A protein has these predicted regions:
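Bacterial N-terminal signal peptides
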Residues: 3-14
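Short loop/turn segments immediately following beta-strands, especially the blade-tip
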Residues: 196-203, 281-284
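A detector of repeated loop/turn-to-beta-strand junctions in beta-rich toroidal repeat architectures
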Residues: 53, 93, 146-150, 190, ...
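Blade/loop signatures of beta-propeller domains
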Residues: 15-24, 43, 53
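Predominantly a core beta-strand signature of beta-propeller blades
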Residues: 24-25, 63-66, 104-106, 159-163, ...
Length: 284
């Protein structure tokens, strides 16, 4: 067994803490009603939702924010596939849509076994084109439910939509491990993060609780290149791949969602009430 001297251990801990504390926050855009669903496109821009205003917006470095869609029906989570197509959870229409580069919109999911979905919220797309999304319900959405459970679903590249898991609490944020072999889901009611193993066909197994208790209500998750989970739940809790909390970033206003982006995928984009922010290490 190798034992570290106290001085070496203290230095290691100090450098480790600096990795998460040496962040510079920039306010990119503001004046929205409630922002959600940041998603970075490989073509060099960020998409985010202004949910109450039914708008999808596009932020490109050095350019004014553009309205991509003004009829997005209560958009929440967004994601891009390898082809640059945009996937959006629409809470008002209770469906998942895909927008191609020409602007054509198609519906991917709106019912399960003949019943309307609750209100799709978080979404992520694998490299092979598999789509996973969460289906909770909040506020007025709860009064119009046809399903008697909250769910996580999988839409394979070919074939019918599948139910990954039923939740008693409301699943919210969703993302992958860096290698795409683990699916992470935040449970807003249980205040935990669950993990599922994914096989080469995208089938999920080994459902388990990875983070037993998050800080606040977990509404968004992003994973960095080291596999650490950045969980938005008011503040930002950072957890290692084993679920151990490494650090907490305290925020003045609650963070609803987060996503990594830009060319090096090391900028953390945050939706904070009516504001969109970016965090990077001070030296970057």
């Amino acid at each position: 067994m190798i034992r570290l001297l106290p001085a070496v251990l203290a230095l290691s801990n100090a450098l480790f803490a600096q990795e998460f504390t040496d962040l510079k926050f920039d306010r990119l855009s503001q004046g929205y009603r409630f922002t959600e669903g940041p998603a970075w496109c490989k073509d060099g821009y960020l998409i985010f939702s202004d949910t109450p205003s039914d708008r999808l917006l596009k932020w490109t470095p050095g350019s004014p924010v553009e309205v991509l869609r003004s009829d997005a029906h209560g958009p929440a989570g967004n994601a891009f596939d390898a082809q640059g197509r945009l996937y959006t959870c629409e809470t008002r229409t209770r469906r998942v849509t895909r927008t191609d580069k020409s602007g054509k919109i198609g519906v991917l999911a709106e019912r399960w076994e003949g019943k309307r979905l609750n209100a799709p919220n978080g979404i992520v797309v694998a490299k092979n084109g598999s789509v996973y999304f969460t289906d909770p319900a909040f506020g007025e959405q709860s009064d119009h439910r046809e399903l008697d459970f909250y769910g996580v679903y999988h839409i394979p590249p070919k074939g019918a939509m599948e139910l990954v898991a039923k939740f008693t609490g409301r699943p919210h944020g969703i993302t992958f491990s860096p290698n795409g072999r683990i699916l992470y889901v935040a449970d807003a009611d249980a205040k935990n993060v669950r993990a599922f193993d994914l096989d080469k066909n995208g089938e999920a197994s080994n459902d388990r609780v990875l983070v037993p208790k998050t800080l606040g209500i977990p509404t968004g998750i992003a994973v960095d290149d080291k596999g650490n989970l950045w969980v938005a739940g008011g503040n930002i809790g950072i957890y290692n791949p084993e679920g151990k909390r490494l650090h907490t970033i305290e925020m003045h206003d609650p963070v609803s969602a987060c996503a990594f982006g830009e060319a090096d995928m090391k900028s953390l984009f945050l939706t904070v009430r009516g504001v969109v922010m970016r965090a990077r290490h001070g030296g970057d």
